[in-house]
Amino acid sequence: MWARTAAWVFGLPETLREICYRRDNVKPVDELQKTIGHRFGDMELLLTAMTHSSWANEQAVPVEHNERLEFLGDAVLELCVSEELFRRFPSAREGDLTRMRSRLVSKPSLEGVARELRLDMSLRLGKGEESQGGRERGSLLSDALEAMLGAVFLDAGYIAAKGVVMRILGPHFPEALVPVRTKDYKSQLQELTQKLFRDRPVYTLLGSSGPEHDKQFDVRVVLPDGTVFEATGPSMKRAEQMAAARAVATLDK
């Protein structure tokens, strides 16, 4: 209420009113909170995480953007993933743990997760960045994802941040084993389905999105019993491996 009164009485510029209210992008940001399973006590943190420097630079008054939160979120993400891998694979060697972590926190991996979360809908971009297709830029999306994790950490601490990391990255953990195992997941899945169902899985390309230099491919694999697994990756081959990894993780339970 004080912000509305101040803007009306003192004739503050519209940009400052907008900053006071923080009402822009309310619906997408609200949906994002539901998706990640965390309701922010301090909404300012989430809005800052979704604010690109190009948007901040266009405002008439100083506005914080997400680069500092990205720095923090990068460290939070690495710690959360490292701890989870350490606990899940007690017999794994350091080199294997490092390779698995690198796969999970790589830019392509984070870009895919950001697209799954529809993070682009919550971003605040400057006019120039928007016109140049910034909302589809993978590096921008992965940076915003890290900033969001930094915001969760500041808002509610490590346990809350770890919970969000596991909700959004947990399904991708089986995929992290792909470069470590000697056999690829598509081969493993075919062996499993032949053994269990006497038939092969069927892969389908659902579509692709993003600019030519940064395309993402959506793939579905259907098992003989009708069970469906989907994944998104930087190539059709990689997406198929990711979908197969999810299927193998389920069948191996």
Swiss-Prot record:
<keyword id="KW-0819">tRNA processing</keyword>
<dbReference type="InterPro" id="IPR011907">
    <property type="entry name" value="RNase_III"/>
</dbReference>
<comment type="similarity">
    <text>Belongs to the ribonuclease III family.</text>
</comment>
<dbReference type="Pfam" id="PF00035">
    <property type="entry name" value="dsrm"/>
</dbReference>
<keyword id="KW-0479">Metal-binding</keyword>
<comment type="subunit">
    <text>Homodimer.</text>
</comment>
<dbReference type="GO" id="GO:0019843">
    <property type="term" value="F:rRNA binding"/>
</dbReference>
<dbReference type="InterPro" id="IPR014720">
    <property type="entry name" value="dsRBD_dom"/>
</dbReference>
<dbReference type="GO" id="GO:0005737">
    <property type="term" value="C:cytoplasm"/>
</dbReference>
<keyword id="KW-0963">Cytoplasm</keyword>
<dbReference type="GO" id="GO:0046872">
    <property type="term" value="F:metal ion binding"/>
</dbReference>
<dbReference type="GO" id="GO:0004525">
    <property type="term" value="F:ribonuclease III activity"/>
</dbReference>
<keyword id="KW-0540">Nuclease</keyword>
<dbReference type="InterPro" id="IPR036389">
    <property type="entry name" value="RNase_III_sf"/>
</dbReference>
<dbReference type="GO" id="GO:0010468">
    <property type="term" value="P:regulation of gene expression"/>
</dbReference>
<dbReference type="GO" id="GO:0003725">
    <property type="term" value="F:double-stranded RNA binding"/>
</dbReference>
<dbReference type="GO" id="GO:0006364">
    <property type="term" value="P:rRNA processing"/>
</dbReference>
<feature type="active site">
    <location>
        <position position="74"/>
    </location>
</feature>
<feature type="domain" description="RNase III">
    <location>
        <begin position="29"/>
        <end position="157"/>
    </location>
</feature>
<keyword id="KW-0694">RNA-binding</keyword>
<protein>
    <recommendedName>
        <fullName>Ribonuclease 3</fullName>
        <ecNumber>3.1.26.3</ecNumber>
    </recommendedName>
</protein>
<keyword id="KW-0698">rRNA processing</keyword>
<feature type="domain" description="DRBM">
    <location>
        <begin position="184"/>
        <end position="253"/>
    </location>
</feature>
<dbReference type="Pfam" id="PF14622">
    <property type="entry name" value="Ribonucleas_3_3"/>
</dbReference>
<dbReference type="GO" id="GO:0008033">
    <property type="term" value="P:tRNA processing"/>
</dbReference>
<keyword id="KW-0507">mRNA processing</keyword>
<keyword id="KW-0460">Magnesium</keyword>
<comment type="function">
    <text>Digests double-stranded RNA. Involved in the processing of primary rRNA transcript to yield the immediate precursors to the large and small rRNAs (23S and 16S). Processes some mRNAs, and tRNAs when they are encoded in the rRNA operon. Processes pre-crRNA and tracrRNA of type II CRISPR loci if present in the organism.</text>
</comment>
<dbReference type="GO" id="GO:0006397">
    <property type="term" value="P:mRNA processing"/>
</dbReference>
<feature type="active site">
    <location>
        <position position="146"/>
    </location>
</feature>
<dbReference type="InterPro" id="IPR000999">
    <property type="entry name" value="RNase_III_dom"/>
</dbReference>
<feature type="binding site">
    <location>
        <position position="143"/>
    </location>
    <ligand>
        <name>Mg(2+)</name>
    </ligand>
</feature>
<feature type="binding site">
    <location>
        <position position="146"/>
    </location>
    <ligand>
        <name>Mg(2+)</name>
    </ligand>
</feature>
<keyword id="KW-0255">Endonuclease</keyword>
<feature type="binding site">
    <location>
        <position position="70"/>
    </location>
    <ligand>
        <name>Mg(2+)</name>
    </ligand>
</feature>
<keyword id="KW-0699">rRNA-binding</keyword>
<keyword id="KW-0378">Hydrolase</keyword>
